Amino acid sequence: MFSYLGGKKFQAKWIARHFPKHKTYVEPFGGAYWVYFVANHQIDQAHTNVYNDFNKDIANIFYCARHKDRAFLKELLLHEPQNEDIFNLFKSDLIPFNTDFELGDVERATKYIYLQSQSFSGDTLNEKTKFINLKGKYRSKYEHFINKISNKKWLYHIKGINHIHNESYETIINEYDNDDTLFYCDPPYFKMEDYYVQDFQRHQHK
């Protein structure tokens, strides 16, 4: 739904073609959830779709888009796209990050997606994150995100996400593990674990 480190937007259809039949579809490392969105015509067979990400701000974006779509859209539209002053203000509000908030925080989700959509390739946000000035040559990814969550087709698939979690991958796998569940696991890139907000160690790839 947005640019994100390790997103599978362009590989999604190929990946989904190799999925076995299933009733529940789960991504323990949800990220931008591109495999679900791009290959939804193949995933629609699932009775239950489950999103999880250990990055609470990313999970919060999906929660707001799914359960508070009107309030989220209203908040998004309040802010001028491609404004460096707004970017820096939101950056000072959010960084360094904390997880002392509940899923459904629309204002926080708006600030996060504003930063995330206007930094290099949706890179993980930190103190060094810089504003990408498009100089009016292109529409910002912030505007593209607004278009998605106000589009009926995208809303249909957003509403098709039955459960949104902010848990460890172990917790999610243990909760949903059964013969009818398909887990698509796309963990942080090997040897690039430090690029992610969540604490995922190299040995955990095993």
PLM-predicted stretches and their roles:
Residues 197-206:
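Glycine-rich S-adenosyl-L-methionine
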Residues 17, 21-98:
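SAM cofactor-binding core of SAM-dependent methyltransferases
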Residues 3-10, 27, 43-44, 49-58, ...:
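Residue-level signal for functionally critical sites in structured catalytic/ligand-binding pockets
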Residues 1-12, 66-184, 188-193:
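SAM-dependent nucleic-acid methyltransferase catalytic core
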